[in-house]
UniProtKB/Swiss-Prot annotation:
Binds 1 Mg(2+) ion per subunit. PANTHER family: ADENOSINE KINASE (PTHR45769:SF3). Its cofactor is Mg(2+). The gene is AK. The lineage of its organism: Eukaryota, Sar, Alveolata, Apicomplexa, Conoidasida. Pathway: Purine metabolism; AMP biosynthesis via salvage pathway; AMP from adenosine: step 1/1. This is Adenosine kinase. Belongs to the carbohydrate kinase PfkB family.
Length: 363
C-alpha cells in the first residue's frame, strides 16, 4: 500500500483522527432517478453491484463534491475552528483514482493535514447524496476504506497531538488501528483518546474489540440509539429496563453511568473518563468520573432551531463531536465543550451536505 503525504500542512497538530474517507457527491435528483436504482427516499444504504453505475450516472445532475465520512467531517470542524493550517490531522485509505485526488485536494483546501494510504486496484470510497423533495437519500460504496492499516511511522505524522479520535466504523477494517491509536495515546502524559460508537451494528458486531478499546478510552460519544444498544449488549442496566427510552432523563443517566463503568473498570486512575450522549432535541447527558473518583452528571440543553430552517440533520453528530473536540483543545469545561458541539451541529443542519457557514468562532 503506497503512501500519499504531499500536503503542505504547517501545524502544530492538536487533534488526530482515523476514519473511512468518503467523497460525497451531492445532487438534486428526480424521483425517477431513485426508482431507477431501487432506492427508497430517505434511506441510507451500501451500494449493491447492480447500483455501482449510480455514481457515473449522477454526473448528468452536476453533483457537488464534498469531503465525507464521519471522522473526516468531525476533524474538518476542528480545523475550521482552529484556523491555522495543519491543526487537525487525519489518516485513512483511498484508491489510486481521480476521486481520491479530488478528495485530497478538497481536504488540502480546508487546511487539513492528511496522510492517505493509497490502495492499488481499489476505488476511493464514494457516497451519492441524493436530494429529492427535501429528503436526503444516501448510497455508499466504501471501496478502499476497508484496506486501511496504520503505517509504521504514523506517530511521526501525529506528533504533537494530544487529542486522538476514532470512530467505531474503523473496526470494520480491523480493530487493530483504533487499538494502536488508543494504546499510543494512553502512554502520553495528558493525551486523550476519544471514541464514537458510530452505529448500532458496530456496538453489536464488535463487542469484544470495543470492550478492550473502551478501557483505553477517555471520552466516549454516541447518540441515544447507539447507547441503548451498548446498554443491551454489555448488560449496563437491568434486563427489564433495556426497552426503556433514553428520552427519559433518569434512564439516560443510568445508561451513561453504566457506560462509564466500561471506561473505568471500577478503578480511578485520575485520568479523564467521560461519556457523552446526544439525544436529538433533548438535552445532552454526560457522565464524568472526576479526579477523586466521584461521578458527576451533566445536562446541557440543545438550542432550538426553527423547523423551516432545518434542511439536513444527517451530519449533526459529526459536527457535535468536532465542536466538542475543538473546545476540549482549548481547555474548556465539559459544559462548554457540549455547548460548542451543539453550536456546530446547529449550524450544519441548516445546509444540504456537510458544510460549515460560520465565519466567526461559534464557541
Amino acid at each position: 500500500m503506497a503512501v500519499d503525504s504531499s500536503n503542505s500542512a504547517t501545524g502544530p497538530m492538536r487533534v488526530f483522527a482515523i476514519g473511512n474517507p468518503i467523497l460525497d457527491l451531492v445532487a438534486e435528483v428526480p424521483s425517477s432517478f431513485l426508482d431507477e436504482f431501487f432506492l427508497k427516499r430517505g434511506d441510507a444504504t451500501l451500494a449493491t453491484p447492480e447500483q455501482m453505475r449510480i455514481y457515473s450516472t449522477l454526473d448528468q445532475f452536476n453533483p457537488t463534491s464534498l469531503p465525507g465520512g464521519s471522522a473526516l467531517n468531525s476533524v474538518r470542524v476542528v480545523q475550521k475552528l482552529l484556523r491555522k493550517p495543519g491543526s487537525a490531522g487525519y489518516m485513512g485509505a483511498i484508491g489510486d483514482d481521480p476521486r481520491g485526488q479530488v478528495l485530497k485536494e478538497l481536504c488540502d483546501k480546508e487546511g487539513l493535514a492528511t496522510r492517505f494510504m493509497v490502495a492499488p486496484g481499489q476505488s476511493t470510497g464514494v457516497c451519492a447524496v441524493l436530494i429529492n423533495e427535501k429528503e436526503r437519500t444516501l448510497c455508499t460504496h466504501l471501496g478502499a476504506c476497508g484496506s486501511f492499516r496504520l503505517p509504521e511511522d504514523w506517530t511521526t505524522f501525529a506528533s504533537g497531538a494530544l487529542i486522538f479520535y476514532a470512530t467505531a466504523y474503523t473496526l470494520t477494517a480491523t480493530p487493530k488501528n483504533a487499538l494502536e491509536v488508543a494504546g499510543y495515546a494512553h502512554g502520553i502524559p495528558n493525551a486523550i483518546f476519544t471514541l464514537n460508537l458510530s452505529a448500532p451494528f458496530c456496538v453489536e458486531l464488535y463487542k469484544d474489540a470495543m470492550q478492550s478499546l473502551l478501557l483505553h478510552t477517555n471520552i466516549l460519544f454516541g447518540n441515544e440509539e447507539e447507547f441503548a444498544h451498548l446498554a443491551k449488549v454489555h448488560n449496563l442496566v437491568a434486563a427489564e429496563k433495556t426497552a426503556l427510552s433514553t428520552a427519559n432523563k433518569e434512564h439516560a443517566v443510568e445508561v451513561c453511568t453504566g457506560a462509564l463503568r466500561l471506561l473505568t473498570a471500577g478503578q480511578n486512575t485520575g485520568a479523564t473518563k467521560l461519556v457523552v450522549m446526544t439525544r436529538g432535541h433533548n438535552p445532552v447527558i454526560a457522565a464524568e468520573q472526576t479526579a477523586d473518583g466521584t461521578v458527576v452528571v451533566h445536562e446541557v440543553g440543545v438550542p432550538v432551531v426553527a423547523a423551516e430552517k432545518i434542511v439536513d440533520t444527517n451530519g449533526a453528530g459529526d459536527a457535535f463531536v468536532g465542536g466538542f473536540l475543538y473546545a476540549l483543545s482549548q481547555g474548556k469545561t465539559v459544559k462548554q465543550c457540549i455547548m460548542c458541539g451543539n453550536a456546530c451541529a446547529q449550524d450544519v443542519i441548516q445546509h444540504v451536505g456537510f458544510s460549515l457557514s460560520f465565519t466567526s468562532l461559534p464557541c
